[in-house]
């Protein structure tokens, strides 16, 4: 960041000087005007947030052995669904894009700012990586690949609907597959509602009725969205943000039955620092059993940057931060 700025008059003088002398040699430019590269790795086993100081909205992450893969919303950008890889959850590198073009192609043949890929989830199941995302105008799509850095399949429309967003699959111990998702009030005229529906075992089609499992309109946890679906110690968990992007907090809801009833509590508060959020993200466990939570913070013109938080469990409830 520049430590001082030029007034308009000084800027005119500087520009005239450049015209007269033919430009200022690069060597004459001082170091104080060069931007530093952001590095979250402090080099001593510690890190600082954000771990990704760039616009990766609604991140989700999965672990396979010692490899971590992250994807995020790409909206109407092409290629879409960036795939980032890391060995330590701190140092990330873009290795691929899972979506070559948006579908339906005729609709996205023209600019559709803010539409497209909303809040994807990434999972590993039976030797394949799956990414699900919601298009608020068309429904839930899925792509899959054996190698995240390789070729991804063509998108499959898992559930056609207007207003469904933030989908996340869960393969249960008995082989059944479920989909959790939220609603966009701008399309469906409802929000703060989380639903679960059964899919076929392949995860390619919703085959059962949708059931409301959490209604944030009935309590103080409004604007419930972005559910991530997990199972641990016999409990089904929905981890999701509430309260809004800039003023919200993290929630967890759990039940012994996939369709509920779910009991819910806050697991990470807003806090009283200038840092807003925490907003949408996901839980990941390392090969050594450590638990971490990745989420985004809305940083205005810098975009939605990615934070990494330690996570523990107490009485079968997650504790984030």
What label would you give each PLM region?
Residues 1-2, 28:
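Extreme N-termini of proteins with methionine-enriched Sec-type signal peptides or N-terminal signal-anchor
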Residues 2-14:
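Bacterial N-terminal signal peptides that target proteins for export
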Residues 12-23:
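Bacterial N-terminal signal peptides
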Residues 28-321:
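Carbohydrate-active catalytic/glycan-binding domains of CAZyme proteins
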């Amino acid at each position: 960041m520049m430590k001082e700025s030029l007034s308009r008059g000084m800027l005119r003088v500087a520009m005239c000087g450049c015209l007269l002398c033919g430009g200022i040699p690069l060597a004459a430019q001082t170091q104080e005007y060069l931007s530093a590269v952001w590095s979250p790795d402090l080099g001593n086993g510690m890190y600082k947030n954000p771990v990704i100081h760039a616009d990766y909205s609604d991140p989700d992450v999965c672990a396979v052995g010692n490899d971590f893969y992250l994807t995020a919303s790409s909206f109407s950008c092409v290629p879409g669904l960036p795939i980032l890889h890391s060995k330590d959850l701190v140092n990330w590198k873009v290795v691929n894009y899972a979506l070559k073009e948006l579908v339906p192609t005729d609709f996205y043949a023209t600019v559709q700012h803010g539409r497209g890929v909303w809040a994807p989830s990434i999972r590993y199941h039976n030797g394949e990586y799956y990414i699900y995302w919601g298009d608020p105008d068309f429904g839930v799509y899925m792509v899959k690949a054996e190698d995240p850095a390789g070729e991804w399949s063509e998108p499959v429309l898992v559930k056609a609907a207007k207003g469904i967003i933030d989908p996340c699959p869960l393969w249960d111990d008995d082989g059944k597959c479920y989909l959790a998702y939220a609603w966009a009030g701008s399309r469906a005229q409802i929000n703060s509602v989380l639903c679960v529906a059964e899919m076929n075992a392949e995860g390619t089609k919703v085959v059962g009725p949708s059931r409301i499992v959490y209604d944030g309109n009935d309590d103080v946890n409004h604007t419930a969205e972005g559910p991530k679906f997990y199972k641990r110690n016999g409990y089904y968990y929905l981890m999701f943000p509430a309260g809004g992007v800039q003023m919200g907090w993290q929630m967890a809801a759990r039940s012994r039955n996939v369709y509920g009833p779910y009991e819910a509590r806050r697991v990470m508060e807003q806090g009283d620092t200038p840092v807003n959020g925490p907003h949408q993200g996901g839980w990941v466990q390392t090969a050594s059993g450590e638990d971490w939570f990745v989420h985004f913070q809305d940083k205005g013109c810098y975009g939605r940057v990615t934070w990494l938080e330690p996570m523990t469990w107490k009485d079968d409830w997650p504790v984030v931060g």
